[in-house]
Each structure stands twice: as structure tokens, then as C-alpha cells.
Design a protein with these regions (language model features):
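Short, exposed beta-strand-loop hairpins at the edges of beta-sheets
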Residues: 121-136
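Generic short beta-strand segments
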Residues: 33-41, 81, 107-108, 124-128
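Sec/Tat signal peptide C-region and signal peptidase I cleavage site
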Residues: 17-21
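Contiguous, well-ordered beta-strand patches that form the walls/edges
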Residues: 63-117
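Bacterial N-terminal signal peptides
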Residues: 7-15
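Short, solvent-exposed loop/hinge segments that bridge or flank secondary-structure elements
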Residues: 23-77, 132-148
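Positively charged n-region of N-terminal signal peptides that target proteins for export
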Residues: 1-4, 16
Length: 148
């Protein structure tokens, strides 16, 4: 009977440890890089051209780098740049309590991010025609954490 009680105590302790490990907030600091397609009305520094909002949209390839400079619990911040423009545009992200979903903003648009693995995420980004660039974009693509 003593062994059964000991086994039960160990099982409960193990389950509690596993639950705490699953609840751990992921560390997302570092450099993330990805490529994808973006739908663009008009133009902006990351999607250059002479197109206007009145013209048909265009699809472009984009390559972005997000550097998550800091993280405090579920809040993270950093800077974004693209192959077309090294703007180092600031962003702010907030992670949900399930530790997989992130929402965020930069100076003219919004992020919706899903953490797929410790070093992989799907990043969706949009900004409206009311943004400072007077362009409109929508995109989703995978990003990988750059290993050093």
C-alpha cells in the first residue's frame, strides 16, 4: 500500500511539473528572417514603385528581418527591416496566455503571429490605406530564428 501511495504522489508531482513546463512563456528574443508574397496597393519603402492606391494591386516577393531586442514576460519589442529598406522600424508585440499567438503593431500596421515551434513562426502583417505611407498591404509567411 505504501508503494501505491508513493507512486500516486510521484505521478501527481510529475503531472504538475509537466503542466508548469507547458505553461512556460517562450523566449522569442533574437533575429527572425522570412520570405513570402505580399499583396500591395500603392507603394512604400518595403514595396517600392510608382503604383498608386487607385491602380490594380500587385503581388511581390518580400524578405523581412525582425529583431526582437527585448522581452518582459508576454510583451516583446524590437525592430523590423526588409531587403528593400533597412528601416529598423520599431514594433511592439503581446503574446496570449496560450503562448502560441501574438498580436502587435508597428508605426503603420498590425501583426498576427502564430508560434509553430521554438525557432519557427508564421507572421501575418497588414496595414490600411490610412497608414502614413498611404499604401495597403497584406501578407502571411513563415519566419525562422537565425542561428548564430
Amino acid at each position: 500500500m505504501r508503494y501505491l501511495a508513493l507512486a500516486l504522489v510521484l505521478a501527481v508531482a510529475g503531472a504538475a511539473t509537466l503542466a508548469r513546463a507547458q505553461d512556460a512563456i517562450p523566449d522569442i528574443k533574437g533575429t527572425w528572417s522570412g520570405k513570402g508574397k505580399v499583396l500591395v496597393f500603392g507603394n512604400n519603402v518595403h514595396n517600392p514603385g510608382k503604383q498608386t492606391m487607385a491602380e490594380a494591386p500587385r503581388m511581390r516577393d518580400i524578405e523581412m528581418t525582425d529583431v526582437v531586442e527585448g522581452q518582459d514576460g508576454r510583451l516583446a519589442w524590437g525592430r523590423s527591416s526588409s531587403r528593400a529598406a533597412d528601416t529598423k522600424e520599431p514594433f511592439a508585440w503581446a503574446m496570449s496566455s496560450v503562448n502560441k499567438s501574438i498580436v502587435g503593431a508597428d508605426t503603420d500596421g498590425y501583426f498576427r503571429i502564430t508560434l509553430l515551434a521554438p525557432d519557427r513562426m508564421e507572421k501575418c502583417y497588414v496595414h490600411s490605406g490610412m497608414s502614413p505611407s498611404k499604401s495597403m498591404v497584406a501578407t502571411c509567411y513563415a519566419m525562422e530564428r537565425v542561428k548564430k
